[in-house]
Amino acid sequence: MFNDIGALELVTLVVLAVLVFGPDKLPKVIQDVTRTIRKIREFSDSAKQDIRQELGPEFKDFEFEDLNPKTFIRKQLDNEELGLKEIRNGFDLKKEMAEVTDAVHGRDAESSSSGSSSGSSSAASGNGRVDMSKKPEKPEKPGKTDKPAADDRPPFDMDAT
């Protein structure tokens, strides 16, 4: 109940209580508040016992905390039958990122070696950096123009517009 109250907030509440009720009435107010909280807890516990008795022995393991959606979902997802813990343990983000990094570095090495063999030194420089500026590609066929052919256009979908 009071898990999310910090030290500064607690001190603020105490100072505010002293200012509002005064040092003379404060002990009486604290006793009244604790007595009220105790009665509310007793009423809640007796209501839970009455509900459990009326539900019968089938619901002996019923927990009222499960009615809270967060705890219900947490309890259901931590169930071993689903195997979610195995999936979480098998998912290693650092390992996957290292694999992706290695794959990218492997492609950079391949492109720099193939770029230097084909005579294109602008693809990768000697220090391992890639030239990111756009440069027009040389046409493969001497008769090919800069305009894309009708086959190169993306398909047009009437339903998408």
UniProtKB/Swiss-Prot annotation:
It holds the Pfam family TatA_B_E. GO terms for cellular component: TAT protein transport complex. InterPro entries: TatA/B/E, TatB. It is found in: Cell membrane. GO terms for molecular function: protein transmembrane transporter activity. Residues 111-126 have a biased composition (Low complexity). Its main location: membrane. Residues 131-161 have a biased composition (Basic and acidic residues). Keywords: Cell membrane, Membrane, Protein transport, Translocation, Transmembrane, Transmembrane helix, Transport. The chain crosses the membrane at residues 2-22. The Tat system comprises two distinct complexes: a TatABC complex, containing multiple copies of TatA, TatB and TatC subunits, and a separate TatA complex, containing only TatA subunits. Substrates initially bind to the TatABC complex, which probably triggers association of the separate TatA complex to form the active translocon. Belongs to the TatB family. This is Sec-independent protein translocase protein TatB. It comes from Streptomyces coelicolor (strain ATCC BAA-471 / A3(2) / M145). The gene is tatB.
